[in-house]
Curated annotation (Swiss-Prot):
Native source organism of the sequence: Synechococcus sp. (strain ATCC 27144 / PCC 6301 / SAUG 1402/1)
Protein name: Guanylate kinase
Top-rank EC class of the record's enzyme: transferase
GO cellular component, one term: cytosol
Subcellular location: Cytoplasm
SUPFAM superfamilies for this protein: P-loop containing nucleoside triphosphate hydrolases (SSF52540)
A GO term, aspect molecular function: ATP binding
Classification of source organism: Bacteria, Bacillati, Cyanobacteriota, Cyanophyceae, Synechococcales
């Protein structure tokens, strides 16, 4: 059995990572989506252990101290991290493991796992991104402003990545992301 690979997927909040990954994973059940841990509150419909591992800040900080994360970062006032052991287990089983993580986490993985493929998902425009975030109706104005400011940084960092996919037309973006992950 061959060893698997790690693919890092990042992009601004609201760019459509979840929508595209759902389509990719339905077409590629052999791939494994790493479940991140976070200190943020669950959104409606999110299930602990399925969408995220929802932890208190104290629990998260204990796991940091015990080096249980492959990467971790603070984003929009919350901590996010990738539990190390499930990723290593799945790679050793020969699977493609997808990490859907923030920019700082992607940079950490680049240092710890330089062979990981790095893919950034971008919106067709900042205006389109803002509209998508507002349509969620899950954030107040201050949170939206923080996310848009962070998005500018993430868009500016696109040149750091191996592959760049623009999420403009859904079918085209799915095909491009599939190629970026599996080819």
């Amino acid at each position: 059995m061959s060893i698997g690979r790690v693919v890092v997927l990042t992009g601004p909040s609201g760019v459509g990572k979840g929508t595209l990954l759902k389509a990719i994973l339905s077409q590629h059940p052999e791939a494994f989506l790493s479940i991140s841990a976070t200190t943020r509150s669950p959104r409606p419909g999110e299930v602990d252990g399925q969408h995220y591992y929802f932890l208190s800040r104290e629990e998260f900080q204990t796991k940091i101290a015990e080096q249980e994360f492959l990467e971790w970062a603070e984003f929009a006032g919350n901590l996010y991290g990738t539990p190390r052991s499930p990723v290593i287990e799945q790679v050793n089983l020969g699977r493609t493991v997808i990490l859907e993580i923030e920019l700082e986490g992607a940079r950490q993985v680049r240092k710890t796992l330089p062979s990981a493929r790095q893919v950034v998902l971008l919106p067709p425009s900042v205006e389109e991104l803002e509209q998508r975030i507002r349509e969620r109706a899950t954030e107040d104005e201050a949170a939206i402003a923080r996310r848009l400011l962070q998005a500018q940084t993430e868009i500016g960092a696109a040149k750091e990545f191996d592959r760049c996919v623009i999420n403009d037309q859904l079918d085209t973006a799915i095909t491009a992301l599939e190629a970026a992950i599996f080819s």
